[in-house]
């Protein structure tokens, strides 16, 4: 039985528009990418391409069918469809982005990956960049400059990032560190 991946994989970008590299460095130590076609749970064991354990300290995987990373690489996994953001996902997405942000701030090399390395990984990478002080559209533009102009083509994600993410991130960070965000509290 073949699995219908329409909800999970980009259908609006042609193959020649996809990035040539599996991952790209967005800022020093912060990488965004996809998953090799043979590095999925339903591939034959001899065909697997594991994330190189020497390259990354930790990985955020947003594609449920990606194989786990190799030995010695810390990983957090949260597979979501490449479709829309709902209220139930926002807290979890912020938690995951914060996990990656904290590790990146500590000097670890962090990879955020999904299937094609365009939308879901772009969403989490954008949240990390917003947590670091970038304005949402600046985060989107930086990702498109460093990864591919077709990154974050999911308009639902871009709309949420540009209209709501900044306030969501501010509230989230304030709940984690009230004295840093609001010194009078």
Q: Predicted segment positions?
A:
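Short, basic/low-complexity N-terminal boundary segments at the transition from targeting/disordered tails
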Residues: 1-10
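Cysteine-based protein phosphatase catalytic domain of the PTP/DSP
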Residues: 9-110, 127-164, 169
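Short cysteine clusters
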Residues: 114
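Conserved G/P- and acidic residue-centered "switch" motifs that form tight phosphate/ATP-binding loops
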Residues: 117
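Hydrolases whose catalytic domains are alpha/beta-hydrolase-1, hotdog thioesterase
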Residues: 120, 124-128
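C-terminal domain-closing interface element
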Residues: 167-185
């Amino acid at each position: 039985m073949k699995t219908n991946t329409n909800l999970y994989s980009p259908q609006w970008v042609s193959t020649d528009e996809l990035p040539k590299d599996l991952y790209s460095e967005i800022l020093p130590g912060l990488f965004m990418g996809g998953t090799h076609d043979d590095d999925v749970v339903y591939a034959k064991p001899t065909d697997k391409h594991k994330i190189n354990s020497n390259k990354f300290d930790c990985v955020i995987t947003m594609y449920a069918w990606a194989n786990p990373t190799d030995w010695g690489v810390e990983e957090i996994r949260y597979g979501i469809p490449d479709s829309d953001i709902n209220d139930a996902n926002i807290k979890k997405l912020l938690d995951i982005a914060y996990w990656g942000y904290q590790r990146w701030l500590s000097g670890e090399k962090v990879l955020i990956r999904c299937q094609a390395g365009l939308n879901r990984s772009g969403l989490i990478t954008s949240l990390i960049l917003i947590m670091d002080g970038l304005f949402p559209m600046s985060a989107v533009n930086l990702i498109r400059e460093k990864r591919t102009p077709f990154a974050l083509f999911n308009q639902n994600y871009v709309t949420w990032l540009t209209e709501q993410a900044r306030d969501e991130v501010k509230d989230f960070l304030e709940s984690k560190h009230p004295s840093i965000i609001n010194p009078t509290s």
